Swiss-Prot record:
Gene coding for it: Sgf11
Keyword set includes Magnesium: no
One GO MF term attached to the UniProt entry: zinc ion binding
Protein name: SAGA-associated factor 11 homolog
Subcellular location: Nucleus, Nucleoplasm; Cytoplasm
Gene Ontology BP, a term: chromatin organization
Gene3D superfamilies assigned: Classic Zinc Finger
Skewed-composition ranges (Low complexity): 157-166, 197-211
Organism this protein belongs to: Drosophila mojavensis (Fruit fly)
Domain commentary: The long N-terminal helix forms part of the 'assembly lobe' of the SAGA deubiquitination module.
Function: Component of the transcription regulatory histone acetylation (HAT) complex SAGA, a multiprotein complex that activates transcription by remodeling chromatin and mediating histone acetylation and deubiquitination. Within the SAGA complex, participates in a subcomplex that specifically deubiquitinates histone H2B. The SAGA complex is recruited to specific gene promoters by activators, where it is required for transcription. Required for nuclear receptor-mediated transactivation. Binds independently on SAGA to promoters in an RNA-dependent manner.
Region span, Disordered: 153-211
């Protein structure tokens, strides 16, 4: 402390050039060089000059280290620079060597993936999702046949129900009487018999060679 006080008093007496180069207690390289040259002009001030130079260099080094550590701590790089201790590394970052597990202890076995059917909202395995969706939506060959059969039966049932309803509404008369139906049936039967008789007669004449 005495050396620094003596240095400051000597600087104040030597001139104001060094004070102009000093800004808020922080000395630049040119200011330190200028002050050192002024101190070594006199033989009595050699010790003060050496102390002054050493103190300036020490302050500069300490300030640089302090600023660097402060920057590393604020940015979070101080831990990365220092590293992790061996005890903490073994406990927190232990490598897993078990079968079917990676180095972090996560299972490497392939898990079966499930898919949700958009039609019935059921969970189906991914390998069977396509056939299930085909059957569920009636888009396959067999499913389309079954769906067409169901549609045909529904249409037949609706047609039969509509015909019965029209028959009931008309009071059982569908355009003709029972007598007319009987006459048509008997006339058709007579026509069939006449055609059969004519065929039989023609075959008998051919057998008897009557032309």
């Amino acid at each position: 402390m005495s050396a620094s006080n003596a240095t400051h008093t000597h600087l104040s007496s030597s001139g104001g050039a060094s004070q102009m180069a000093t800004t808020q207690g922080h000395l630049t390289a040119s200011a330190i060089t200028l002050n050192f040259r002024e101190l070594i002009k006199e033989p009595k001030g050699l010790e003060d000059a050496a102390n002054y130079l050493f103190q300036g260099l020490l302050d500069d080094v300490v300030a640089g280290i302090f600023i660097e550590i402060h920057h590393l701590r604020k940015t979070g790089n101080l831990t990365a620079l220092d590293g992790v201790g061996e005890e903490n590394a073994e406990s927190a970052y232990r490598i897993c060597e078990m079968p079917n597990l990676d180095i972090f202890g996560i299972s490497t076995a392939k898990k079966p993936m499930d898919c949700t059917c958009p039609h019935c909202d059921r969970l189906v395995a991914a390998a069977r999702f396509a056939p299930h969706l085909e059957k569920c939506m009636g888009m396959g060959r067999i499913s389309s046949r079954i769906a067409s059969r169901r549609l045909a039966t529904k249409e037949g049932a609706s047609a039969s129900s509509s015909s019965t309803s029209t028959y009931i509404q008309s009071g059982g008369n569908t355009g003709g009487t029972d007598d007319e139906d009987d006459v048509d049936w008997s006339s058709d039967k007579r026509k069939k018999k006449s055609t059969q008789n004519s065929r039989n007669n023609g075959s008998k004449k051919n057998n008897g060679k009557i032309f």
